[in-house]
Curated annotation (Swiss-Prot):
Assembly information from the UniProt record: Monomer. Interacts with ARRB2, AXIN1 and CTNNB1/beta-catenin. Interacts with CTNND2. Interacts with LMBR1L. Interacts with DDX3X. Interacts with TNFRSF10B.
Residues forming the catalytic site: D244 (proton acceptor)
Residues where ATP binds: I125, G126, N127, G128, S129, F130, G131, V132, V133, K148
Stretches assigned to the Protein kinase domain: 119-403
Phosphoserine modifications at: S2, S21, S72, S77, S97
Record gene name: Gsk3a
Any further remark recorded for this protein: Simultaneous silencing of GSK3A and GSK3B by RNAi stimulates replication and promotes survival of INS-1E pancreatic beta cells.
Kinase in keyword set: yes
Regulation of activity: Activated by phosphorylation at Tyr-279. In response to insulin, inhibited by phosphorylation at Ser-21 by PKB/AKT1; phosphorylation at this site causes a conformational change, preventing access of substrates to the active site. Inhibited by lithium.
Protein name: Glycogen synthase kinase-3 alpha
Biological process according to GO: autosome genomic imprinting; cardiac left ventricle morphogenesis; cell differentiation; cell migration; cellular response to glucocorticoid stimulus; cellular response to insulin stimulus; cellular response to interleukin-3; cellular response to lithium ion
This protein's GO CC annotations: axon; cytoplasm; cytosol; microtubule; mitochondrion; nucleus
Length: 483
């Protein structure tokens, strides 16, 4: 499936023709990519031109997105193990390759500890301007992993690596190891991120239903979106903004419905008062303040993007399929109406004198199909707000009534499997917005001491299933690159 925005494309009922398929966004800088494993063919967008690793799973969406090179960040230099190349010369990157590759790698989490790691069955599963993604199998455990190989600027620490090393959550793809390797050119250094392998993406799952002319079952929409919001609540509590939320970066296991957020190549620790590039995030999912050129934005840009993903799953197509940066704003205005002067000021004060055509908001009930649950529409409208501070927080989204079915005892997946772990909250998660805990923790999991605490069995579930060691966000981030 080729990339780029569909021709036409206003939301249902707004007067412009729309395609019926899930379109791969054009994204930033470069042209839009194809579907997973596809080729680029869409129109260019607004952004910095970093191809998305849509993901470490069954395929790699090559849509481009904003953000600087993944090798941006604070000072520092490359690490150990740079004397060898990966894959080694002569290794056949085919499906049947039995060649074993051994590298000295550092554990992804915890103290820096190196060990030998052996791989086999190496094959390319995606590439882009960021580098290459391989699939491999750990020789010792036979576990599949994805290896993201990116060119490392020796002058900087790699921001993606620094962020991945501090994240530990059941809804975020885990960094197993990392190692450095040399390139073909002199002094060329590559960083290799060894990540857990997850077979599918929300993009591919949704496209499967669309191709079959089916609507994705609402229970999957609930399970996927809930886990996305939970992952956002966690990274935002760590001071990290993802800055490239889209269906291609949401990995899912089609059997268990576990979702994991991936591709932190555009992510950044946001610090109040420090400027950030607005040329970020794939076009269809860009918050309006980014289109307005804001540099003091907050993590609420991720919430807008998540709202776009929710709307896309409900509609079966992107809700704001802009053909360019300016057209992206037009698509948003066609649904939300012209922003008020105050809303514009909240997004970027420099635009308050700009004259916009006055367009009335399109009723949300007419944007979506008649059978769309009212709670889903209500949640969408609370996420897709012009004013960044008016959007729900990720945990407020988790507590929304749209997800009440997930908190009901006995709810199962359509394949009769149990729901994935949804309530194995760590103490850190429960401390983000404690006032919501009475809603977030289902009645059957509450302890007798009160609704804000989990039962001991649930607490054990937390410890065994997440392995989280939550900590407050760093007061003084070590990453100093201003992008």
């Amino acid at each position: 499936m080729s990339g780029g925005g569909p021709s036409g494309g206003g939301p249902g009922g707004s007067g412009r023709a729309r395609t019926s398929s899930f379109a791969e966004p054009g994204g930033g800088g470069g042209g839009g990519g194809g579907g997973p494993g596809g080729s680029a063919s869409g129109p260019g967008g607004t952004g910095g031109g970093k191809a998305s690793v849509g993901a470490m799973g069954g395929g790699v969406g090559a849509s481009s997105s904003g953000g600087g090179p993944s090798g941006s960040g604070g000072g520092g230099s490359g690490g150990p193990g740079a004397g060898t190349s990966f894959p080694p010369p002569g290794v056949k990157l085919g499906r049947d390759s039995g060649k074993v590759t051994t590298v000295v790698a550092t554990l992804g989490q915890g103290p820096e500890r190196s060990q030998e790691v052996a791989y086999t069955d190496i094959k390319v599963i995606g590439n882009g301007s960021f580098g290459v993604v391989y699939q491999a199998r750990l020789a010792e455990t036979r576990e599949l992993v994805a290896i993201k190989k990116v060119l490392q600027d020796k002058r900087f620490k790699n921001r993606e690596l620094q962020i991945m090393r501090k994240l530990d959550h059941c809804n975020i793809v885990r960094l197993r190891y990392f190692f450095y390797s040399s390139g073909e050119k002199k002094d060329e250094l590559y960083l290799n991120l060894v990540l857990e392998y997850v077979p599918e993406t929300v993009y591919r799952v949704a496209r499967h239903f669309t191709k079959a002319k089916l609507i994705i079952p609402i229970i999957y929409v609930k399970v996927y979106m809930y886990q996305l919001f939970r992952s956002l609540a966690y990274i935002h509590s760590q001071g990290v903004c993802h800055r490239d939320i889209k269906p291609q970066n949401l990995l899912v296991d089609p059997d268990t419905a576990v979702l994991k957020l991936c591709d932190f190549g555009s992510a950044k620790q946001l610090v109040r008062g420090e400027p950030n590039v607005s040329y970020i995030c794939s076009r269809y999912y860009r918050a309006p303040e980014l289109i307005f050129g804001a540099t003091d934005y907050t993590s609420s840009i991720d919430v807008w993007s998540a709202g776009c993903v929710l709307a896309e799953l409900l509609l079966g197509q992107p809700i704001f399929p802009g053909d360019s940066g300016v057209d992206q704003l037009v698509e948003i205005i066609k649904v939300l109406g012209t922003p008020t002067r105050e809303q514009i000021r909240e997004m970027n004060p420099n635009y308050t004198e700009f004259k916009f055509p006055q367009i009335k908001a399109h009723p949300w009930t007419k944007v979506f199909k008649s059978r769309t649950p009212p709670e889903a529409i209500a949640l969408c409208s609370s996420l897709l707000e012009y004013t960044p501070s008016s959007r729900l927080s990720p945990l407020e989204a988790c507590a929304h009534s749209f997800f009440d079915e997930l908190r009901s005892l006995g709810t199962q997946l359509p394949n009769n499997r149990p729901l994935p772990p949804l309530f194995n909250f760590s103490p850190g998660e429960l401390s983000i917005q404690p006032s919501l805990n009475a809603i977030l923790i289902p009645p059957h999991l509450r302890s007798p001491s009160g609704p804000a605490t989990l039962t001991s069995s649930s607490q054990a579930l937390t410890e065994t299933q997440t392995g989280q060691d939550w900590q407050a966000p760093d007061a003084t981030p070590t990453l100093t690159n201003s992008s």
